[in-house]
Structures are given as structure tokens and as C-alpha cells.
């Protein structure tokens, strides 16, 4: 990575931090904004075109309930336009899936990019089509300056920020908590005490899906934001401090409170290493004998619970805020998914425009497991109390909201299967005693990705 490119990554990280502060302020919604000149999917925008006989391909990493909920959005678009829409499952690595098709000259029309780092990489390589004329007015109207920044590269709009994520939640199995006689904790130490009680009750408390690694990076980011604070988090995100810094080692040591006790992990460490993310959810809520009682992951877990199990939110599943560590103030790690145009087709342009409207967002919001970054989507649009509470927690964190750190990194360090943060966090789960070695390996991988 050249010095000029590294500087763009640094500026990008700073901008995204500001964006999530804007989202925290706006997430309460409730404002009725005037219609802009860009139109919407239902009042004459591109998505209202007659696209009968055309096929639109959409690639995304969503699976299970998330894929089903997004399919409802695509079905609404198809009904409006007459287009046939094909969802392409990209597995865990979107870049690896669409890369060969781009190189072969046959990319899918639209890709749902799971982090700004992927958008930046694709745009820098010339693989994304600018969408200012497609959805610029809609982005300004419905997402505001923050949404424009998330979807932009070098001041050019390339993506529509469609789905936000509040990743600072801990989901728990309500009946197990009740039967074990424990209350939801507010601090890390209390959570470990609850875990011990649940373990004594006969249930291994923490369910972890670590076959790929990104859930482990989410855990690190939540711990680091609380132990090091927002300012240090920003510095690490920009690689202004090395991964061998004592603050990183402190966060890894805290994580080892769980990783270093395999009897607290559902099925033990080996089971966690073989369990995918959805499996870490269903092994708790899809069985009469739950394997696990707590899952440290984001708001989107709720949608998977209701979509893939018979469990009911509030009765069988609920969440508490990620706990304070050593008196840390409330803080939230956020994320998001961005729709980008890979092929400049009529159908692809129309779908991008549709995804920039509240009509599209409210379809998923009503089903659960979804937070919209649009300021024009009111909290009343959410079909369950869980979604509203997650959105409110994002709002209340204020200036302590930070974007998912791994998502801000060069893709080879922050979002690639088997390497960088994903791979090294898996290695740390295997060997949680090697804090120094893990920090050194993270620094080597980061330096290589940044071209240092």
C-alpha cells in the first residue's frame, strides 16, 4: 500500500467515526423530512420502471433468516418492476466470490458490501459504478451526510448504506437464566460470575461460532473499546499505534477470561472452532436442551432466532448491553452493509435506487433483526421491541459509538477468511495463553496490509 493510499485509509477511518456519531444522533428517527427531488421507488424513481423480462443478480453474504428477510425486500422490488431478481450467496467472503466474475467480465448487477473497507477496495480498483445520478438525491434525503460518507470513495458516491448493525449486545437464553436464578449482568466481572453459576447449573454458558473468525473480532472490538477507550480505538483503527501496544494486550487478556476456560464454552473450544455463526445461535434456541446460554453478538441475532427457530423474542431470547469493564462508560461498536453497483445495467440501477428508500428498509424493519441507518425510518416501523431497544442503545451511546474496527482495515487484514484479524483471532481462541505472540502476529499482518 502506497503512502498516499495509506493516508486515504487514515482519513476514511476518521470519517467513518464521525459518521457513526451522526447515526447515533439520528437513530431515534421520528422526523418527517420533505421529499427531495430524487424521487423514490414508488413515486416515479428508477425502481418504478417496467423491467419485465430483465434479470437482476444480487450477491451478498447473508444466509438463513437474514437472506430470507432480504429476499422479501427483493420480492417487493420484483413486484413493482416486473424484473426477475436472483440472490447469489457469496459465502463468508464477498470479494472472493465476485472477484472471478469481475475478472471474467460478468459481474452480478449489485453486491451487498459487508464493510466500508470492501467498498474502498472495489472503488479503488475501478470495480464499482458511481451512482450519483442513480441515487444521489435519495441518499441525501433519506441518509443525510453520514450515509453519503459511508457510501463514498474520494468524494464520489458508490454505495447505498442499507443496513446498520448495533454490535454491542449479549443475547441470552431467558429460561436458562430463570432456572439458574441469575440476573442479567452489567459488568464483565458480573457476567463471568453469571457464567460460573450457569455452568454449575449444568449448561456451558458461552456459545461461540468461530469457524471463520469475524465474531471473534467483534468481541475484541467491544472489549478494546471499553478497556482502552474511544480515542485509543481510533488510533488503533488508523494503525497510529502498533498492535503490540499494551492496550491491545490488555484487551486480549480480558478475552482470555472466556477463551482460557473451555468449560465455559458450549461444546468446548473445538466445537466453537467448527461452529458457524448461525450454528452458534441455533444450538441455543433450536433445542429443548440448549447448548449455551449467552451469545456475544449484535442486534441481527434476533432476526436469525425468529427466522430459524421457534423461539420467541422476550420470552425465550433477549439481550443485555455489552457489559462495562472496570467502570467503563456505555459504548457501542457498529457496522453496516452497503449496496454497490457492479454492472451498469438498467435493472441494477433501479434496485440501487429502491434500496435507498424507506419503503425498502421498512420491509425488513417490520420483520426484525434489522436497523436502518435512514433518518426517515421511524422507530415505530420496527416490528418488535428488540429492534427498537437496539436502535435506542445506539442513540444513547452518543460520542462513544465506533465503527467496527476490522471493517475499517485493508481487506486482507480485516475481512479475509483465514488471514489477518479473522485468522489470528481464531489462533488466539486455540491458544489464549499466547497474548504477546498474538499481538506480535497482528502487528506483522497489519504492517504488511498497510505496506509498511
Protein language model features and the residues they cover:
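Extracytoplasmic ligand-binding clamshell segments of periplasmic binding protein
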Residues: 230-308
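Extracytoplasmic/periplasmic substrate-recognition and gating elements
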Residues: 75-76, 300, 306-371
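Short, solvent-exposed loop/beta-turn-alpha elements that line the ligand-binding surface or hinge
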Residues: 132-143, 210, 227-251, 307-312, ...
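Hinge/lid segment of periplasmic solute-binding proteins
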Residues: 47-50, 116-168, 192, 318-319
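C-terminal capping/gating helix-and-loop segments adjacent to ligand/active sites or protein-protein/ligand interfaces
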Residues: 161, 370-377, 391-446
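Conserved N-terminal structural module of periplasmic/extracytoplasmic solute-binding proteins
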Residues: 2-8, 27-120, 363, 437, ...
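Periplasmic solute-binding protein
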Residues: 120-126, 147-186, 203, 209-236, ...
